[in-house]
């Protein structure tokens, strides 16, 4: 069979975590790669770019669950990746488990941004940020 993979961010995982039960019920061998920066990434990025790094209610290091343990509590397999050189081998291992749902929790630095980013509502291409400190 074909494996399905999804990339996600941790906050959305908390809103839909109960679906791990549905996946077990139907035997869905999905691979979930969770990009975990322990923050509301786009909110924090906006606070960096528009408000000079004045953060408010955008980081959650102390209050997050252990997603690997949570995944395993639902009967699936989970891996935590905290070092870049472990990512490739961990993904290979995850995708080799053809008959299991596997959750890979990948920690990234909170200062990492996603580009390009359109910062003006209904804006044009000229309103886009191409890199940190670099507008179109």
Functional labels for PLM-detected ranges:
Residues 32, 78-80, 103:
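Conserved beta-strand scaffold positions in the cores of enzyme catalytic domains, especially
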Residues 17-20, 42-47, 114-119:
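Short acidic, glycine/serine/threonine-rich loops at helix termini
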Residues 48-93:
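Conserved thiamine diphosphate
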Residues 9:
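Active-site loops and adjacent core secondary-structure elements that bind or stabilize anionic groups
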Residues 13-14, 38-42, 111:
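Short gly/pro/ser/thr-enriched loop/turn and capping motifs at secondary-structure boundaries
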Residues 1-6:
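Single conserved hydrophobic/aromatic residue that forms the stacking wall/gate
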Residues 25-38:
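A glycine-rich helix N-cap at a beta->alpha junction
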């Amino acid at each position: 069979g074909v494996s399905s993979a999804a990339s996600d961010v941790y906050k959305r995982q908390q809103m839909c975590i109960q679906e791990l039960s549905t996946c077990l019920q139907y035997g869905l061998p999905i691979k979930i790669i969770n990009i975990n920066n322990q923050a509301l990434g786009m909110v924090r990025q906006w606070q960096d770019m528009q408000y000079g790094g004045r953060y408010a209610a955008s980081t959650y290091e102390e209050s997050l669950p252990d997603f690997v343990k949570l995944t395993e509590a639902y009967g699936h397999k989970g891996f935590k990746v905290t070092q870049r050189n472990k990512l490739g081998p961990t993904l290979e291992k995850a995708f080799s488990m053809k008959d299991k749902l596997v959750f890979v929790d990948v920690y990234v630095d909170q200062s990492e941004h996603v580009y390009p980013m359109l910062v003006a509502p209904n804006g044009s291409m000229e309103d886009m940020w191409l890199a940190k400190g670099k507008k179109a």
